[in-house]
Amino acid sequence: SRNEMALKVIVYFVTAPNEREAVLKGADYFYVPPSGDVLVNPEATMGLAKIMHLLGISWTMSSKCFDGANYGLFTGDDAAMKADNKAYIEEAKRLKIKHMIPGECGHAYRIFKYMMEKQQWWGDLPFDIANVLEFTAGLIKKGAIKLDKIRNPNPVTYHDPCNFGRSCGIVEEPRIIMKAACADYREMTPSGSKNWCCGGGGGLSAMDTILDFRMNVAGKKKTEQIKETGATFVAAPCANCKRQLTQLMEHHKMDVKIGGVHDMVFNAIIL
């Protein structure tokens, strides 16, 4: 399909020449990013690719299942949500992987870990599931990778996506990464599970028909939070948040770039 062709072209572009040999089956890790982290914001995927290359870890992606976003969850269609999820599980089994790593997408991780795995939709699975933030934070804590924070010298902050922070309790892991990778990390107030929503959650960020509401009402508190930090970069591990925050910064004429947590790893990792 055209989607598969597009994915293959982009993955070819963002990987080094010596990394372009496809791993089809038997890889240790199966990486499932949101499509935005391949098509729009590849730096996040490139950050993980550098880690895997450095440590000699075998990993793969699928041209059949390459978007961790689950649109059944977005639209409230439970049957579609489970069907979408099952396709990824069948692909993971076909690839004979040992670990599944959902990328910087909180609602994808919420479905894989807290809905599918814990409720055993498909019974016991022959692989474990840990999101990319847990994976990288664990490597930093063990000293397996080294980051040069001087390569990210400008003030940065972290936005807690609702699904990661409130629904899944992933709060400390991204901060471990950001503090190790950035020379000037600044915290929002409030933060963690009490951080303000970006104003574009639940797919609202895709609705430009209500742009004025999103920019001036739903996103008002988040804009104020970012401004108070003085940061010039906001890490937001969520495709919805990235779009909403990018539009907020443009609308309010703030010179702030939006990206992912692994964008900082991509810059800072010592190979």
Language model: regions and residue ranges:
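Short, flexible loop segments at boundaries between secondary-structure elements
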Residues: 121-150, 190-193, 250-271
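Short, flexible loop segments at the rims of nucleotide/cofactor-binding pockets, characterized by
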Residues: 76-81, 208-215
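Short Fe-S-cluster ligation motifs
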Residues: 1-8, 222-247, 267-271
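A short, acidic, amphipathic alpha-helical segment used as a generic capping/interface helix at domain edges
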Residues: 85-87, 213-232
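Redox- and metal-dependent alpha/beta enzyme cores, enriched for Fe-S-associated oxidoreductases
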Residues: 62, 141-145, 151-211
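Iron-sulfur-cluster electron-transfer modules
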Residues: 1-118
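Hydrophobic packing residues within well-ordered alpha-helices of enzyme cores
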Residues: 111-115, 178, 245
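Local cysteine-cluster metal-coordination motifs and their immediate loop/turn environment
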Residues: 34-36, 64-75, 103-110, 159-168, ...
